[in-house]
Amino acid sequence: MKQVIKYKNREEWLQNRSKGIGASEAGTVLGLNPWETPYQLWRRKKGIDPPKVENFAMVAGHLLEDAVAQFFKRESHCHIIKASTDDYTITNTDTPYMRVSPDRTFWRTGATHNEASKSILECKTTQMQIDADDLPKHWFCQLQMNLGVGEYKDGALAWLTAGREFGYRDIDFDPEFFGWMRDEITKFWLDYIVGNQEPPAYSAQDVLLKSPLHKAGKEIEATAEIGDMLIELKEIKEKGKTLENRQKEIEDNLKLFFGDAESIVDGNGRTLATWKAPKASEKFDAKAFQADHPEECAAYIKQVQGARRLLIK
């Protein structure tokens, strides 16, 4: 059974997001969000990393929700429900840690204006070109979680690309997909958030977060697959070196041809290449300052741990 929680202001709504898994985080839990991994989400939820601060893109997306909704209304002729513009959260008594806040709800043309006939609209602003037949997977997950927790039968994803192109797609609720997603989110919440287990690394960045330093002397035996990867990587690096050497050779020959000229042009005067010195700039001579004022510098010198380097032997 669903429950609706209303808030006094957006700040209160933002604070409430930390109490569960939001629809925008569903794709992350499933490993389908290109911007964040399950491990990084876990670190944020557990307070290891600071909470997300609304950046310009996030604020702009919120402010432009109404514009996207109006484009959707214009194209689809659906009725946007005004009350749905407020900040609120829908939860379900069965899974109270799954918390959704649909951007808008609407009634389709000809539908009876009652609760059972409502549909959900998710509004997106993006710089990416969107293919309506191949929508971003984390967008799809977000809408399905909104539909499932909110107990709606269908909805739509609408997007505005670079402020110039608008598109939308109607999407039905998929009970089978939602059931699988609910199970995965439940496992993530109970095992990692409530159970305090640390999730496995999902990317190389996760490994650096988990293990910024190596364990001296520790060795692991390569599997056949890893052995093949190492051989392939060495071959790729060798090809890269060959290309880099050829690139340098060509650049050196071009510079010999330039002499003291600024540009190389074709027979029609079109510029093909330039070789110019940058304008002179002022630079603080740290080494000279340290030599002249060693005591003052000593108070500001600190040890900085370098990142782990991958070397192929």
Which role does the model predict for each range below?
Residues M1-K313:
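Accessory terminal regions of nucleic-acid processing enzymes
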